[in-house]
A protein has these predicted regions:
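ATP-dependent carboxylate/acyl-activation modules
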Residues: 3-13, 17, 95-427
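Active-site loop-to-helix "anion-binding N-cap" substructures in soluble metabolic enzymes
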Residues: 1-107, 196, 222, 228
Length: 427
């Protein structure tokens, strides 16, 4: 047309806050097209493409920096333009990934191509160690769930290791239908007790492993009442998590300085939740281990477990699922007495569990039969160590070449053994 249009030097554009919109409880997929901002997206994309000549700004937080650069120097340096362009591309990618995540059916994260958008929930003081940076992220656009939905009632902000302990402890507590207290430390169970009285659950867990409670996390699957709260004040537990707290319990717990008190009413897990682990050169993704058994465990010995043994075996099996492999758990009645984790072999794990038990009560016998759960199939030598340690009932995955010999040994010793038919490795 013979008209020379001026060039754009700065393009400032943002998009609908799609993550906040689709995460609303009453949002419907039919409304999504109203918030797909194609015009601004195209303009920002074009500006970011021509980053050598055009300054692309997608965050309000960058406005003052850009204005100051034009005011003081007449423009931005090439490096600053590239930085802003990269931020724009990241912004666009996160926007589109959020839409893709929202529209995708559950369980598609194992497709050939995976696009994921994460938003920062909180900056953490440090990672596993003080020299490591860390932050807590959640899926962009997802409705708050799990620890992202937790409410901190009292105490300092959480660090990286607190999140790990809280996740393990509360997941373990939610495995139980009856009242339970699970104490975890360093991302593994220390003690678990399931009794009708919540206060007795806490007493049992603390008595089983007093050292494990120091700096650990106590999780409950019921609203915490005043009696249990008063007992917690006498411990060195660092964090408490439960579905809720009575007003009196919350008042008591808030009186202890430094105690982190969290409520987490929503279930930690969704049926389709996945686990991601970074490795050199890539990321491993797997479905979460949400299954306790494939089917009812099979009793493979002549003697069947008594009612008390069966209850103890189930308690121990739920606990060993959350201990690091190789793991062994010894329980008595409704209390886990010893947890051995991260053994280099199942034999070492069982021997360590027996040693810990004897170290804590070297003389007096217990009130009931001891049971042992192992997360991996047991060779004959390992089973011998378990029975020699006092176990009268064992639950293990089965499927080892020594299975028949193990059954024969249990029958000779009058012990009972269940094959769970599923293993629970955890690394």
């Amino acid at each position: 047309l013979g008209v020379e249009l001026p060039r754009f030097y700065v393009v400032a554009a943002d998009l609908y806050p799609i993550a906040g919109i689709v995460s609303q409880e009453d949002f419907s997929v039919d409304e999504l097209s109203n918030y797909l901002d194609q015009a601004n997206s195209a303009v920002l994309r074009a500006a970011a493409k021509d980053f050598g000549n055009v300054v692309s700004v997608c965050r309000h937080a960058d406005y003052q920096e850009v204005l100051a650069a034009f005011r003081d120097a007449g423009g931005l340096e090439p490096e600053a333009k590239r930085k802003l362009a990269a931020r724009a591309w990241q912004y666009l990618a996160a926007y589109e990934a959020t839409v893709a995540q929202y529209l995708s059916p559950a369980g598609t994260l194992l497709d050939d191509e995976v696009v994921m958008s994460l938003r920062k929930v909180s900056e953490l003081e440090y990672g596993e160690n003080r020299h490591q940076r860390a932050a807590f992220y959640a899926l962009s656009g997802a409705r708050p769930s799990g620890l992202n939905a937790a409410r901190l009632h009292s105490g300092p902000w959480l660090n990286f290791n607190h999140y790990l302990d809280l996740d393990t402890a509360f997941e373990l507590a939610l495995e139980f239908e009856e009242p339970v207290c699970a104490v975890c430390k360093h991302d593994k169970p220390s003690a678990v007790c399931a009794l009708p009285s919540q206060a007795d659950c806490l007493r049992g867990a603390l008595a089983a492993d007093p050292a494990g409670a120091v700096g650990g996390t106590a999780a409950f699957n019921r609203q915490v009442e005043a009696e249990a709260a008063a007992l917690l004040l006498e411990t060195f537990v660092e964090s408490v998590v439960a579905p809720g707290y009575s007003p009196e319990a919350l008042k008591i717990l808030r009186s202890r300085e430094g105690l982190r008190v969290l409520s987490l009413p929503a279930p930690v897990l969704s049926p389709h939740e996945l686990e991601l682990r970074s490795i050199s050169g890539g990321v491993l993704i797997e479905a979460k281990d949400n299954r306790l058994f494939h089917a009812d465990p099979a009793c493979v010995t002549r003697r069947k477990p008594t009612e008390a043994e069966a209850a103890s075996l189930l308690l121990a099996w739920k606990t060993v699922k959350y201990a690091k492999t190789y793991a062994a758990v010894i329980a008595e009645g409704r209390t886990v007495l010893s947890v051995s984790a991260s053994g280099s072999s199942s034999y070492d794990a069982v021997r360590a569990a027996v040693w810990h038990l004897r170290d804590r009560r070297p003389i007096l016998p217990g009130a009931g039969p001891l049971v042992l759960a192992a997360d991996a199939a047991l060779p004959l030598k390992t089973l011998k160590a378990a029975l020699a340690g006092g176990a009268s009932a064992v639950i293990q995955p089965g499927g080892w070449q020594d299975d028949e010999d193990c059954v024969r040994l249990c029958d000779e010793r009058g012990a009972t053994m269940l094959f769970a038919g599923i293993r629970h490795f955890r690394h």
